[in-house]
Design a protein with these regions (language model features):
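Active-site capping/gating regions of soluble enzymes
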Residues: 1-189
Length: 189
């Protein structure tokens, strides 16, 4: 399992209790998708061995192709962000509508019981599971690769948000715009 927590133990992949907490959750969720998308080769290299190469994609799940599974409800929430966030300044009504949708995430995830076993990188309610490592393998290399790639992705995300803020875009709107760009860019994964 791949948890990402703060120094005070807050799980950043757990939905929040309010729209602000869910904005944090969505930010880390979307950045995890982009991290996998940009670093597929690194992640594959981190779990590679002769026996694991033979196992992946053979008669066992998961396949050798890295993909992410979120579940239909969470995927539709990301689709809503893409649909609702434009490139122009958002009206207060648009922001409210978007934040109300984000506020429903804990309700959505409580109903999601589907645990897709065929995806090597699946979201299971409050964490991602990286299922590509072999059962007898030491997962240290893959954890180092995931954490380093995630740190790099978060730095890139922050820089993009700060750039928009320097151009006069408000913080929440800048985050929404970069979330939208990141969702679209990482969609193939």
């Amino acid at each position: 399992s791949d948890l990402l927590c703060t120094d005070t133990g807050i799980n950043l992949f757990a939905p929040g209790k309010n729209p602000k907490g869910n904005m944090l959750f969505l930010t880390f969720l979307v950045n995890a998708l982009m991290m996998v998308y940009k670093n597929q080769d690194l992640l594959r290299a981190s779990i590679m061995s002769a026996s694991n190469s033979y196992r992946l994609g053979a008669n066992e799940a998961p396949p050798a192709i890295l993909s992410c599974f979120l579940g239909s409800q969470l995927s539709s929430t990301l689709d809503e962000i893409v649909r609702q966030v434009g490139n122009e300044k958002m009206t207060p009504e648009e922001k409210t509508t978007l934040k109300l949708g984000i506020g429903r995430i804990p309700e959505i995830l409580l109903d999601t019981t589907d645990r897709n076993r065929t995806s090597p990188f699946a979201f299971t309610g409050n964490r991602f599971e990286f299922r590509a490592a072999g059962s007898s393998s030491n997962c240290a290399a893959s954890m180092i690769a995931i954490n380093a790639a995630m740190a790099n992705q978060l730095n890139e995300f922050r820089a993009s948000v700060e750039k928009l803020m320097e151009e006069g875009v408000g913080k929440d709107e800048a985050i929404f715009r970069i979330l939208k760009e990141t969702i679209i860019a990482s969609e193939p994964i």
